[in-house]
Amino acid sequence: MGQVIAISSGKGGTGKTTLCAAVGSCLAAEGKRVLCIDADMGLRNLDISLGMADLAPISFTDVLCQRNSLRDATPHPEIQNLYLLSAPALERPESIHHQQFGAMLEAAREQFDYCMIDSPAGIGAGFRLAVEFADRVILVAVPDPASLRDAAGTADRLDRKSVV
């Protein structure tokens, strides 16, 4: 059974997308099957960080709406075992049904060793979607007062939800 790991931050620009791409790539290079999901709807960049700019036409909402399956996730052109589901460009996080997203992640646990979710910044609906079904959350911050305050607030919310 695979693990779902969300990479999150209370603030933008902390490096969560870069970390998600790097950890996913390293795990895949070790022979693990890895699915990276960009959950930053409207501001997706995980494809760029993975060196797959505009090469991942399948979004996670395509899977949720059953237009595609997890097996259709875009394979990385150079790194074996690494796959990407991009974020939809026009969807709003509030329009995504959490239970459908959770069911997709449960299916991903069966097909992949790791599912890495690149969460949007902040604590809004996109953040809640990304972390609700995660086994673990990696919280990213940079050493400045605003980032540290936002990280503390985000950690508090995660702690209240019992997501570590």
Regions flagged by a language model, labelled:
Residues Q99, A103, A107-E110, Y114-V164:
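Conserved catalytic-core segment of NTP-binding enzymes
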Residues M1-Q3, E30-R33, I79-N81, Q111-F112, ...:
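Short coil/turn connectors at secondary-structure junctions
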Residues C36-E110:
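P-loop/Walker-type NTP enzyme "switch/lid" segment
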Residues G12, A39-G42, P88-L90, A121-G122, ...:
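Short, ordered loop/turn segments at secondary-structure junctions
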Residues L27, G31, L50, L158:
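Active-site catalytic pocket residues across diverse enzymes, especially alpha/beta-hydrolases
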Residues A22, N45, K161-S162:
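Asparagine-centered polar/low-complexity signal
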Residues A6, L84-S86, M116, I138:
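Structural motif
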Residues G2-A39:
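Walker A/P-loop phosphate-binding motif and the immediately C-terminal alpha-helix
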